[in-house]
Amino acid sequence: MSHRVSILSSHFSPASAVMASEKEAALAATPSDSPTIFDKIISKEIPSTVVFEDDKVLAFRDITPQGPVHILLIPKVRDGLTGLSKAEERHIDILGRLLYTAKLVAKQEGLAEGFRIVINDGPQGCQSVYHIHVHLIGGRQMNWPPG
């Protein structure tokens, strides 16, 4: 297994605490249109704990949560949208759908007191999977500034 695949796999395994950090995974990741681990989650090749699914968006619990609630929301079809910096006008609808779905999931998860939305973009933004995804984190008091 290549170093890059090992790091990306560690992001979704319980042993990730002893594996590579998110920063290392982001620095090892290569932006491309190649299938990602999220494509395998969408196709159910890799199990996940789904909390929301419709025809456009899949939301599931992060395997390495950064709060009591940590959910990833992804578009089911990437359409070249590997990161926010790659967004084009044709992506407006799915970007809005991801954020609106985050609001629905936050309500479903009981996050009435607030939550944080994060989109990492590129190596310096700590993006480790090049399939745009929204982190919904809540259930605790957040700090400012973030990382």
UniProtKB/Swiss-Prot annotation:
Transmembrane segments: none annotated. It holds the Pfam family HIT. It catalyses: adenosine 5'-phosphosulfate + H2O = sulfate + AMP + 2 H(+). The active site is at H133 (tele-amp-histidine intermediate). It comes from the Eukaryota. Its EC number is 3.6.2.1. One of its GO terms (biological process) is sulfur compound metabolic process. GO terms for molecular function: adenylylsulfatase activity; nucleotide binding. The keyword Plastid applies. Residues 37-147 form the HIT domain. Keywords: Chloroplast, Hydrolase, Nucleotide-binding, Peroxisome, Plastid. SUPFAM superfamilies: HIT-like. It is found in: Peroxisome; Plastid, Chloroplast. InterPro entries: Histidine_triad_CS, Histidine_triad_HIT, HIT-like, HIT-like_sf. It is an enzyme of class 3 (hydrolase). Substrate binds at H135. The keyword Cell division does not apply. A motif (Histidine triad motif) lies at residues 131-135. Possesses adenylylsulfatase activity in vitro. This is Adenylylsulfatase HINT1. It comes from Arabidopsis thaliana (Mouse-ear cress). The gene is HINT1.
